[in-house]
Amino acid sequence: MIYHLSIGKPDQVEELTKLIHRLSSEFQIFCFQGEMGSGKTTYIKSICSAFGVDDGEMSSPSFAIVNEYSGQNARVFYHFDLDRIEDPSELLRIGWEDYLTSNNLIFIEWPEKAMSLIPEDAVIIRIGHESDVELRTLEITTL
């Protein structure tokens, strides 16, 4: 299924958050694709916040590759930023398969760096810019 959303600013994500919440009952992995500065990290932070993660606990995992957040009801979220990896095998060395089998929600920025390791049932969220600098179009694809 394909969903299309238009969002005025990355912090105006209520509709996206509701959709991700609904999809999270069926899907575990959410991949965010978009140019640098398109709002990937901001969207993920907003979604995690809606799941009860403390805003102060969240940061971009650019240097750590993965951050772990705790939300409501002891729910755990993994936030990956794959921009800095040079080879997908780097993920295997940090326990990638354990993350995938954890049954926790996984949000991935720059998934194209390791598509060979991302399960086929991952939700792909493509973020595009319109001519208006603030407007983002999102295409969310599920199996």
Model-derived regions, located:
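N-terminal pre-Walker A segment at the start of P-loop NTPase domains
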Residues: 1-18
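Short phosphate-coordinating micro-motif centered on Lys-Gly-acidic
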Residues: 1-3, 89-91, 97-143
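Phosphate-binding P-loop
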Residues: 21-27
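Hydrophobic anchor at the beta1->P-loop junction of P-loop NTPases
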Residues: 30-32
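P-loop (Walker A) phosphate-binding loop of NTP-binding proteins
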Residues: 35
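Conserved lysine of the Walker
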Residues: 40
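Short beta-strand-centered segment that lines the nucleotide-binding/catalytic pocket of NTP-utilizing
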Residues: 54-68
